[in-house]
Structure formats: structure tokens, C-alpha cells
């Protein structure tokens, strides 16, 4: 998901039974006010299947938010400030940078996590069409051009598969 999409998520966007989240809006600051806007393009409106550990984490966040009365009227955001307002993407990026520094990790942009997730999914053999839909891209070609980095083990695997076809061996 894009930062503007996950920062605009509301609890009603989560289907706990199907373990999906519906991306239906984005949030951004325009002229000093918060704007709940349409997604980047129509293809960006999509359901995304959540991994079980993410569902468990979100349930925990919801429980804690309810216990601290953070679900304010009209502000049913998943990610919000203590006053119930949306979190600014720049604020989130600043804190992400500080966490990386404290953990001694390389500096990356928060948006790079989107790239990493897409690359990992493709490397794991997830269909490019599925990855493209999860990312909200208009075309699978764009997804592959942007995220399908050739990892070293992929070259080895390709050579082994071709050799197996040519010589009738198991890859």
C-alpha cells in the first residue's frame, strides 16, 4: 500500500472474517486541512488479502485504541494521533528514520518497504498479476518493470531450469 492509503485506513475497511483490507481512499494534507481523497487512480481501489500476523497485530491495535478511547467520533482511523487526527506522512517518515538509526539499520525511505514487499512476493513466486493488483497498478507490465529486480539466486535458478529441460535432468 502507498503511505497515503494506509494512513487513510478506517476500521470499517477491514473485513476480519475474510482477512482483507479494502483500499478505498487516501489521506493527505491540502491547504492546511486533511483531505480524504479518492485513491491515486481507479485501479488503486482494491481489496488486499492480509497475512495472519498482520490481522493479529491490527486486532491488538484496535483493542488498545478502544481501551484508550482513541476511536473518536468521525475519526475511526487505524493510524491516528492521540487526538484522533490523521498522521502526516512526513511525521511518520521522520520517526521511521529515527527507528532505523537507533536499530543500526541502513537508511531507507518508508516507501522502500513497498518496493521490498513487491520484490519479495515476486521472488517467492507470487503471480505478477496478483502483486500488481495488491499494489494497485494499472498494468502488470508496470509492476514488473518497477519491482522485478533480478536477484542473484534467480539467475542460478534460471540456468538450472534451462539445463534440466535441455538435458532431461531434475532442476
Model segments located where?
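Short functional hotspots where side chains directly engage DNA or cofactors
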Residues: 18-23, 109, 120-121, 132-150, ...
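Short, basic (Lys/Arg/His-rich) helix/loop patches that form interaction surfaces
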Residues: 48, 62-133, 137
Amino acid at each position: 500500500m502507498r503511505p497515503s492509503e494506509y494512513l487513510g485506513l478506517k476500521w470499517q475497511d477491514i473485513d476480519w472474517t475474510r482477512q482483507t483490507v479494502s483500499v478505498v481512499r487516501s489521506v493527505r494534507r491540502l491547504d492546511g486541512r486533511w483531505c480524504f481523497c479518492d485513491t491515486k487512480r481507479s485501479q488503486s481501489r482494491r481489496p488486499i488479502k492480509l497475512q495472519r500476523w498482520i490481522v493479529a497485530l491490527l486486532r491488538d491495535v484496535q483493542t488498545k485504541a478502544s481501551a484508550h478511547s482513541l476511536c473518536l467520533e468521525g475519526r475511526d482511523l487505524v493510524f491516528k494521533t492521540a487526538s484522533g487526527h490523521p498522521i502526516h506522512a512526513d511525521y511518520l517518515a521522520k520517526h521511521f528514520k529515527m527507528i532505523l538509526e537507533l536499530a543500526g539499520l541502513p537508511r531507507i525511505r518508508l516507501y522502500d518497504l513497498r518496493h521490498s514487499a513487491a520484490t519479495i512476493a515476486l521472488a517467492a513466486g507470487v503471480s505478477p498479476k496478483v502483486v500488481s493488483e495488491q499494489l494497485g497498478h494499472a498494468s502488470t507490465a508496470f509492476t514488473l518493470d518497477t519491482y522485478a529486480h533480478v536477484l542473484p539466486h534467480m539467475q542460478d535458478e534460471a540456468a538450472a531450469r534451462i539445463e534440466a529441460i535441455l538435458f532431461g535432468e531434475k532442476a
